[in-house]
A protein has these predicted regions:
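Short, small-residue-biased leader/transition segments that mark boundaries at the very start
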Residues: 1-2
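Central I-helix of cytochrome P450 enzymes
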Residues: 5-10
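E2/UBC-UEV (E2-variant) core
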Residues: 11-16
Length: 151
């Protein structure tokens, strides 16, 4: 499963991960999940940090949450940037049948995430630019791409 969210949009994803944590408490290791989460500042906005660390220790989030702190450095870093950086892992999970959950603002974020996933499919799947976009559309048609966005 791939989870992606900026800011407070992470709340519904936390609930999904907590459910998985309970469901797989007796199964070792649980199926891999990747959380890509964004906020402005590590020290002020890192929501649910303790939960992500506990889930990493339990093996639910191997490597921990992938976090984009957009204001902690000169160049802004967003979740779509982190998705591209994690491209090989994202592609492997998608090819293994992962579902994608995108939660947060309905403004520019959903399109930026869709474009980042298309870039991942293009680069790591060798699909070409049009093939990458078609791959992401296919995820929607297969009901593997889920949006929970608001304005």
């Amino acid at each position: 499963m791939l989870f992606r969210s900026p800011g407070t949009g992470v709340a519904p994803l936390r609930a999904l991960l907590q459910e998985r944590e309970l469901a797989f408490a007796s199964r070792s290791p649980p199926p891999e999940a990747l959380l890509v989460f964004g906020c402005r500042f590590r020290e002020r906005d890192f929501l649910y940090r303790e939960d992500w660390e506990r889930m990493e220790r339990a093996g639910l989030l191997p490597g921990g949450a992938v976090v984009a702190f957009s204001r902690d450095q000169d160049r802004k870093v967003y979740v779509q940037d982190r998705l591209r950086e994690e491209g090989a892992r994202v592609w492997r999970l998608l090819e293994e049948g992962a579902h994608v959950y995108v939660c947060g603002s309905a403004n520019k974020m959903p399109g930026a995430v869709r474009d980042a996933l298309a870039d991942v499919a293009t680069e790591h799947g060798g699909l070409g630019e049009e093939g990458g976009a078609a791959y992401v559309r296919g995820l929607s048609l297969k009901r593997r791409y889920h949006l929970e966005c608001w304005s």
